[in-house]
A protein has these predicted regions:
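N-terminal accessory segments
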Residues: 1-52, 57-63, 67-70, 74
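SAM/dcSAM-binding transferase cores
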Residues: 1-34, 227-285
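Conserved Class I S-adenosyl-L-methionine
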Residues: 172-173, 198-219, 233
Length: 285
């Protein structure tokens, strides 16, 4: 008998992955956490039935949410990561010798526990001396911060359920206040393809654009995410994501990546016409 995991992208569309076995399942105080072993994508983490990562394509998301801002802000040393309990963002950040502090704020300790046990390739740098983990509500945490961080990475789940508060105008305003005078915030903005996701993306972008003087959207292609097409937000007090990219300095780090390159960095901000139109709709109102 075959066992398949299916995630509904809309009521009429679902994405299915054949499963060899279920490795972990637990209902935490916040969400259901499952980890599956699959023949095609390796181990797969889901939260409340939504794919958060697979071993096969996780590098795409983590490299794009980390290396894009790090290649622009060459002096980023103090970094706040919100969400990202799987450890992938931390793994990429610890590759930079200049980073002095990584504060990770994760709501659900069970996510960290599960990923340490079953996804060691993701959680392998969570014990780095520069990493400080705080299990608390990110909204409450960020309100206490003022001009403290060079970079904030918001690696939340989708803007529904437990993470809904991380897509509000209040939250983005708190992030602005928590950044130093040349700080950058990046966040995942979901897929623009299906109607519900597209509306959530537009709301998020409108709120960010009204908060930060520089606000852009960039893209990546992630096979196991909705429609295989994913967006990130880049918001900054000072730096432009393309004009202030120092490609030669980043290349000099000799950092091996599987997805990110400085050429791709530039190309990721060149968006298809339908998406440019969607963004203009909210920027002009």
């Amino acid at each position: 008998m075959e066992f398949w995991f299916s995630e509904f992208h809309t009521p009429d569309v679902k994405h299915s992955i054949r499963v060899n076995k279920q490795l972990y399942s637990k209902q935490s105080d916040y969400q259901r956490i499952d980890i599956f072993e699959t023949p095609e994508f390796g181990r797969v983490l889901t939260l409340d039935g939504n794919v958060m990562l697979t071993e096969r394509d996780e590098f795409i998301y983590d490299e794009m949410i980390v290396h894009v801002p790090m290649a622009v802000h060459k002096e980023a040393k103090d970094i706040l990561v919100i969400g990202a309990g799987d450890g992938g963002v931390v793994r990429e950040l610890t590759r930079y010798d200049r980073v002095e502090r990584i504060d990770l704020v994760e709501m659900d300790p069970q996510v960290v526990e599960a990923c340490r046990a079953y996804l060691p390739g993701k959680a392998c740098r969570m014990d780095d001396r520069r990493v400080h983990i705080y299990f608390e509500n990110a909204l409450k945490y960020i309100r206490r911060c003022e001009e403290e961080y060079d970079l904030i990475i918001v690696d939340s789940s989708d803007p529904f359920g437990p993470s809904e508060g991380l897509f509000t105008r209040e939250f983005y305003g708190s992030c602005f206040n928590a950044l130093k005078e040349d700080g950058i915030m990046v966040n995942q903005q979901g897929s623009p393809f299906y109607a519900e996701d597209a509306s959530a993306m537009q709301r998020s972008h409108k709120r960010i654009a009204s908060t930060f003087p520089i606000s852009r959207v960039y893209q990546a292609h992630i096979p196991t995410f909705a429609a295989g097409y994913w967006l990130f937000g880049f918001a900054s007090k000072k730096y432009h994501p393309i004009d202030d990219l120092d490609a030669e300095s980043w290349k000099a780090l000799n950092m091996r990546t599987r997805y990110y390159t400085t050429k791709l960095h530039i190309g990721a901000f060149y968006l298809p016409a339908f998406l440019e139109e969607m963004l203009r709709e909210v920027e002009e109102h």
